């Protein structure tokens, strides 16, 4: 019997890879696969699965390691190797199948995403490496819990430890979180992975894995535990981590320059980022319908002849060309695509005005004027299913023209 066959037959963790695969598949289709087209968002999305994969894997590894903690169980490993070697093989039996499942998922999700991103793929590769180290860390954590607490108490302790560690060291944006592998729930276009962040994260995880796998365990007063010196050092290290990590400022992403180079049409000309090229036809169709509505209302000359997609959080537009941002809900494959309702407000909104980006938001009167102007344009275009709150009345042609002109000149009520 080969070692691989033996491990599959006698260990729980390799079989748990099927459960991990189910988690990965669920994560793949969750929320309508909104990440399609964006490289960084795609990689970050697949990393969110570790929130569930980690504790499940830790629990499975604890079962197998716990069985080896029983006296006389060395016979479970062929070849009669040392117990330390047996634990390493048991850890590998949990780690390798889980990593294989994850890497297959990463490959599939990247093929589905079919990203045409303008940014370098290497930082994303480093982020995937950190995810792989995260999987290995959770398996090592489970193995230690099994060694210390056995095959009955060890698994629930390992699962709980995985959850607690994630909430403590994996949920703090803006700080270094060594268990944060993905949290992007909306477009991160215009951002790139911070390679230094993920290299440090990978190094921290590698050190922790080494420490967990080489942890000495002794039977002291009938209880399996590390020596007193190791216990004291571990307590100091945990306290230091609780104090140090929350105060260490670090960003997972850094800004990167991208340009909306995928364009179509003339008057209006619509340009999107290559990552979002699937929205190009819908955006052009909606913009053309809105310009036709503007012509019927006598304001076509005030509407932009070119619309360019903007990144989330972008500052004032440096030119007079129109801007638009794809709504979050439109990224799902359940969405009907971009419509006039999505672009009407953005065709009127003066993205070049610094007043829109200050600490104080524009007045309620500005919001009311914008709502009425957008509603008037949509009504003239025959839009249906308007998601906005309909105003008490739409605008006359003269009032609409005056409002849009004041917006273009950054004059707000």
Model-identified regions with their sequence ranges:
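Aromatic- and glycine-rich beta-strand/loop motifs that create alpha-glucan
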Residues: 1-17
